[in-house]
Amino acid sequence: MSFVIAVPEALTMAASDLANIGSTINAANAAAALPTTGVVAAAADEVSAAVAALFGSYAQSYQAFGAQLSAFHAQFVQSLTNGARSYVVAEATSAAPLQDLLGVVNAPAQALLGRPLIGNGANGADGTGAPGGPGGLLLGNGGNGGSGAPGQPGGAGGDAGLIGNGGTGGKGGDGLVGSGAAGGVGGRGGWLLGNGGTGGAGGAAGATLVGGTGGVGGATGLIGSGGFGGAGGAAAGVGTTGGVGGSGGVGGVFGNGGFGGAGGLGAAGGVGGAASYFGTGGGGGVGGDGAPGGDGGAGPLLIGNGGVGGLGGAGAAGGNGGAGGMLLGDGGAGGQGGPAVAGVLGGMPGAGGNGGNANWFGSGGAGGQGGTGLAGTNGVNPGSIANPNTGANGTDNSGNGNQTGGNGGPGPAGGVGEAGGVGGQGGLGESLDGNDGTGGKGGAGGTAGTDGGAGGAGGAGGIGETDGSAGGVATGGEGGDGATGGVDGGVGGAGGKGGQGHNTGVGDAFGGDGGIGGDGNGALGAAGGNGGTGGAGGNGGRGGMLIGNGGAGGAGGTGGTGGGGAAGFAGGVGGAGGEGLTDGAGTAEGGTGGLGGLGGVGGTGGMGGSGGVGGNGGAAGSLIGLGGGGGAGGVGGTGGIGGIGGAGGNGGAGGAGTTTGGGATIGGGGGTGGVGGAGGTGGTGGAGGTTGGSGGAGGLIGWAGAAGGTGAGGTGGQGGLGGQGGNGGNGGTGATGGQGGDFALGGNGGAGGAGGSPGGSSGIQGNMGPPGTQGADG
């Protein structure tokens, strides 16, 4: 016969949805009734009247049919609602007699043995560490253990009866000051059928001690698997240790052992549970950071394989594989070694676990692979210390005849890691009788210090001024050039601003050109660190004593990836052109902006780490079998990515042309942006592991295993991207001409800088940097 399952809540919800749909349809019918039933005739003739009457009759028929359908819909919704109510009443009515019947069946066993025939055990109260109650003698799961109070262990899970699963152990209490408490043991599974309960997690450590051990997984009876071990308790912080993972439960006559629990920080994973007669040992638990993985559980007394070793925590070895079954079975594979992590066990990777041995008949387990080597650190460019010292200012010269201001002195050199000083300002050149007045050139920026010093900025050009009516020219001094970045890397210095050319008479005035920005350091940006060597592979297990092959050695770990190179240093910004200013009828022209500096070359990527040593192959059985092959050396690490080339400096803005008289004004041209630096060379791929493992010895009938080969070399790092070219400087603004004067002309924008060249050849070629943005016309 078929079974019908009804959910009253779902029926009630469906009835509500149907009622909403009916309301929507009724509203639509009502809205359409008046326009459709009273159709107005298109004209006064008999045909139009007949057509209108025909369509009106159609609408009236539809409304009559809609009313009948609405009544049917309401009856259907009511029936659905009543059905849901009937199911609720029926369930409530039948539940009590069934519960009473179950009570009658359980009463004799409860009175005689203190345990029901059918039913689940009660859960222990949390915070008390009380054990879970046992399940029914015939059918039922054990109850879960209650969690422990602070510092107190968790309660054990309740045992099942004939059929059922054991209860989960309670969590151990956290340590307030002392260690965390152990988790409760998982309950035993059913004698006939059922799995063991999972062990409870250990409690967290107190301020200075260790976390609690995870509870052992529950065992089981005839058919079923052992329970999982509980996780170790958490560490309290830096300097404390977590708890060891709980061991897995023993499997039934036909069943597997349970997996070991994961270890807390710095604590080992739990050992896998053993199989009994037929089955596979449980896998070892994962080790916490800095601690090994748990060993795999042993195989059964008759037929079955050993469990696999657990993964090692960061920097620690993988667990060893469990031994194969006593009569027939393979050893379990060793766990993989943990990867290298900076600050954990000296940054070294863990070795792979050894494969488990076979007993009489069977092959040894394979060794685990070594952990991955430590990744290299990315290159970091040094910073620059500000330099408060400046070059001497040029001498001011004022008098009749042509006058030129003195040049500014160069900026002082920077110390180690210090920027060069700013160049001195050019002196005033002033002609009082209308002859030429020329400002002095700004001083060059000071030499950058080694180890990251920035180039010094160039000094500003001096003011050139003429005050008479003899038609002399006023020319501002050129800005000083910025200095190149330091030998070991540094940003180029900015070019100095051109000086103002000011003519108060009838002659022309020209602003000084801006200084050239210094180049970003031509030396490479900081190189990335080399990757670490991969961990050693584990040894293969021994084959069965009579017949069986040795296990293969584990492969060496992969070398760490090289660190990325640092970006090249940016070129200095070109100096702005000086202002041309006239008060009379002469032309005022702004100075040209300075050229942006070249970007520096990106740093080389770090070399990939070497692959680890392969593990040795296991020996074959004494009578018949092949020796295990040695593990291959690990694959070399990937080279680091080359650094991005430094950006070219932006060109300086052109100077403004300004007049308060009637002369023409011309804005200065913007400076050309600097060329972007070349991308850094990609790092060399790491060498493959050169030492493969030795092959295992062969049996009396058989031969030795082959030695492991050399690992493949790592992939070369990708070349860095070329640096972006600097933006061209904006053209200077031409001022509005005075009344009756000449036109005003804006300066041209500077050209954008070229993109940097691609990365070096040892890595994958870098992409070409994008060109600089064209400066806007004034």
Swiss-Prot record:
Q: Pfam families this protein is in? A: PE, PGRS
Residues forming the PE domain are 1-92
Source taxon at top rank: Bacteria
Chain positions covered by the region annotation Disordered: 125-163, 372-510, 718-778
Residue ranges with Gly residues bias: 402-429, 436-510, 718-763
Listed InterPro entries: PE-PGRS_N, PGRS_rpt
State the family it belongs to. Answer: Belongs to the mycobacterial PE family. PGRS subfamily.
Q: What protein name does the entry list?
A: Uncharacterized PE-PGRS family protein PE_PGRS46
